[in-house]
Regions:
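A common structural junction motif
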Residues: 129-138
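Conserved small/polar residues in nucleotide/adenosyl-binding loops
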Residues: 229-236
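Aromatic/basic-lined ligand-recognition segments
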Residues: 155-195, 199
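Flexible glycine-rich active-site/ligand-binding loops centered on an Asp-His dyad
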Residues: 137-140, 144, 148, 213-228
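Oligomerization/assembly interface segments of phage tail-like spikes and tubes
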Residues: 110-114, 200
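Feature marking long nucleic-acid-engaging regions of large polymerase/nuclease enzymes
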Residues: 192-225
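"Short basic amphipathic alpha-helical interaction patches in structured regions
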Residues: 124-130, 205, 218
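Charge-rich, low-complexity segments
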Residues: 1-110, 118-121, 125
Length: 236
């Protein structure tokens, strides 16, 4: 499924040191990829139900100009697992083939695009109408807090990511100040939803912000990861 380990690590710009620090065998990662490939058609069905029920032909209600979606490939799933276990081993150390869907919250991704930043309020109110937002329901422990029976709610508090110097006034009435972060290189509002038994990641930004976000994700992040590990190696 994943093929040769060395080729995989090179493809996803994962240093050997990072792979070793993740603490999962190649056989375990391949088992997760195979299980995921078996389930992926179901993820597409859930994505399509979300779009049909809540997004398609509802521009006036959502405030969206356009949108796009993606489902993670098996390779990108394994890449994320490796990186997350290195970044936060305590949180992800219990992840296995049997429970990885309780840990990975962005297998289904939705990105809504706005013409103007002010249109975000329309979309935010629309989500609140269809998904409960209660702090007592937020998932802090991926295993203990995963509720099989509860659906259509926000798994964590909505979060605003901004660049330093951006104005946060538009979000102040809706998002807690602790969840407005101004130390990023991109702009976006993030939601994690529980929908039909699956976690679904929703990101909202303007068309202008989308252009910069693409540059940041595809160029800056891989470069930062490689630079970090090169620096670590030089210090040893």
């Amino acid at each position: 499924m994943l093929g040769d380990k060395t080729a995989f690590l090179n493809q996803y710009a994962i240093p050997e040191k990072m792979y070793e620090e993740a603490g999962m065998s190649w056989a375990d990662l391949e088992a997760i990829a195979e299980d995921y490939a078996y389930r992926v058609d179901g993820f597409y069905m859930i994505r399509d139900m979300f779009l049909k029920e809540l997004i398609e032909n509802k521009e006036d209600e959502t405030g969206l100009h356009s949108y796009r979606t993606r489902i993670k490939t098996p390779g990108h799933l394994v890449e994320k697992i490796i990186r997350r276990r290195v970044e936060n081993y305590r949180k992800y150390k219990e992840l296995t083939k049997e429970n990885y869907l309780k840990f990975v919250t962005d297998i289904i991704g939705f990105r809504g695009l706005l013409l103007y930043r002010e249109d975000w309020v329309v979309f935010h109110k629309y989500l609140l109408k269809h998904f409960e937002n209660h702090a007592s329901w937020y998932v802090h422990d991926c295993l203990k807090d995963f509720d099989e029976s509860r659906d259509r709610y926000m798994v964590e508090a909505p979060k605003v990511h901004m660049r330093p110097g951006d104005f946060a006034d538009i979000y102040a009435d809706w998002i807690a100040s602790d969840d407005i972060h101004a130390q990023k290189y991109y702009r976006s509002v993030h939601y994690i939803l529980k929908y039909r038994g699956m976690y679904l990641e929703v990101q909202v930004r303007t068309l202008f912000e989308e252009g910069w976000g693409e540059i940041d994700h595809h160029i800056l992040y891989p470069y930062k990861n490689c630079l970090l590990y090169t620096s670590d190696a030089a210090d040893e």
